[in-house]
Structure formats: C-alpha cells, structure tokens
Regions:
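Conserved S-adenosyl-L-methionine
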Residues: 1, 171-181
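SAM-dependent methyltransferase catalytic region
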Residues: 1-167
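Conserved nucleotide-binding/hydrolysis micro-motifs of P-loop NTPases
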Residues: 6-8, 54-57, 152-154, 180-183, ...
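Active-site lining segments that contact anionic ligands and/or coordinate catalytic metals
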Residues: 45-46, 142-146, 170-173, 188-193, ...
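Generic structural hydrophobic/aromatic packing signal, biased to beta-strands
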Residues: 49, 166, 175, 212-215
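Extended hydrophobic-aromatic, low-complexity segments
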Residues: 59-62, 147-148, 156-160, 175, ...
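Low-complexity, flexible helical/coil segments
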Residues: 83-103, 110-111, 125, 180-187, ...
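Flexible, glycine-/basic-rich loop-and-beta segments that form/coincide
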Residues: 185-254
Length: 254
C-alpha cells in the first residue's frame, strides 16, 4: 500500500485521492481495523512486522520529526546544588528515563555533581532510526518484529540512545549479522537483523536480565558482484549440475 509510513498524520488526506482509492481502498479498510484508536493512524495492533527500511537520506521536515521520540537528543545540564525538594537519583539516566523526566528528578553523577536533563529536537534524523520507533508503534503488546538495520546501530557509541529506547519498549530476542554481499549490487553496507518482542504482561513480561541469541551468517548467498550463488550436485554421470527443489527451481546456497 502506497503510504508515507513516517508521515501518518497525512494519511487521511492521501486516502481521499480517487486514483489512490481505486487501487488501495480494500487494503486501507483492512488496515483501519487494526488501529488502536479509530481516529488516529499512529498506533496499530500488528502481530508480526518484517521490515527492511530505507537507509539512505535523512528526514529533515520538522513537522514529521516532532512526532518521534528518537528525533530528540538528551544533554545533562550541570547544577550548583540539587533544588530543594527535588527527587535525586544516583547515576546517569537512560534515554527513556530522560524522555519521561518531568523536571522534578535530578541526577547525581559519580563525581558528586548534580545534573538535570535537557531535551533538544534534532533538525534531521536518519530514516532507519525513525522506522524503528514507527514499527514499534505498529506492533500490539506481545507482537514481534524483525528489522534490518545497519551494523553500526548495534555498536556505535552515538547510537546508545537508540539501543536504550529499543530495550525499554521490547525484549531483544536475537541479532543476526548478515554477510556483506546480501544486498549487493545495490549496496555493500554491513547489516544485521534485529528480532524483538514488545513487552506485554502476559505474552512477554518485562524483565531486566535475559538471554539474547546472537549469530553470524556464514554463507554469503551472493558473490561479490551481487549474483546469487546456487547449490550444485553430482549427477549419475559424475557431472556437476545445479541442484533443484521439488518444483524444479534453483536452490540458493545458504
């Protein structure tokens, strides 16, 4: 269905277009039934989402950015003393804690200084980061998602807030590193697939400590030019021939 996923506030304008409606009206009717609020296109009740969001380009429109928590950054402003009556918490806050701070909580650092959180709206943000938040809004509690992300999102120090945000909203089930040839010839960006399940009191109760499955793809499935690598077999004459499945299709090596 042709909709700007990130700009959900304008969906109601899009669906009024006659040409669009002729093509997608049936799909739109089904999608509307999954909304948690019939008057809003923000939150849905999807059981499963599988996503490969676009990596290229940043979102720069302030109207869109303002709808997303992940378009904000957190800084800690130093105070001379803790304000009287303030709730003082030891240690640096996580990104979700800073987002939910109503201004009454002050944080005492390891050096003894006091800090208060300060949020700043970014002027641009990578699309894949916003898609993480958007897709989590699509999921119902207990719903599961698999999403392809650049490898850097998992280990860059600058993406710590993203990782904290994900861990706050869902259980990380697995991270599978893909081979660098997987998306060739279009891109050679190293990627991983993140598998998560949204926290839910019954289906996925929130816990602080749990196991996460990690794996790395060993077979490239494609060569360096981006052509698929197929499995071969030896026929009765001793010749090396392509291996076919029960439908007569070539089998990709994986």
């Amino acid at each position: 269905m042709h909709l700007n996923t990130l700009d959900y506030e304008r969906w109601d304008e899009t669906v009024k277009d006659e040409i669009w409606s002729d093509t997608y009206s049936e799909g739109w009717k089904k999608l509307k039934k999954l909304r948690t609020d019939k008057n809003s296109n923000r939150d849905f009740n999807f059981d499963i989402i599988m996503a490969n969001p676009p990596f290229a380009g940043d979102v720069k429109e302030s109207r869109i950015l303002a709808k997303y928590d992940l378009s904000r950054s957190v800084s800690l402003e130093k105070l001379k003393n803790a304000p009287q009556g303030a709730n003082v918490v030891a240690g640096e806050p996580t990104f979700p804690e800073a987002l939910n701070n109503n201004g009454e909580t002050v944080y005492q650092m390891s050096d003894g200084t006091f800090r208060k959180t300060k949020l700043k709206q970014a002027s641009n943000m990578s699309r894949d980061i916003l898609f993480v938040e958007r897709n989590l809004d699509f999921l119902k509690p207990g719903g599961r998602m698999a999403i392809v992300l650049p490898q850097g999102r998992f280990n860059n120090s600058s993406d710590k807030s993203l990782r904290e945000y994900i861990a706050d909203r869902c259980r990380i089930l697995a991270v599978v590193g893909l081979h660098g040839n997987v998306f060739k010839p279009h891109t050679g960006t190293k990627t991983s697939v993140l598998f998560v399940q949204k926290w839910d009191e019954e289906l996925c109760p929130k816990v602080d400590d749990y196991n996460i499955f990690f794996a790395t793809m060993q077979e490239p499935s494609k060569d360096n030019s981006g052509d698929k690598i197929y499995r071969n077999t030896i026929d009765e004459d001793g010749n090396n021939v392509p291996l076919l499945d029960s439908h007569g299709h070539l089998i990709v090596k994986h």
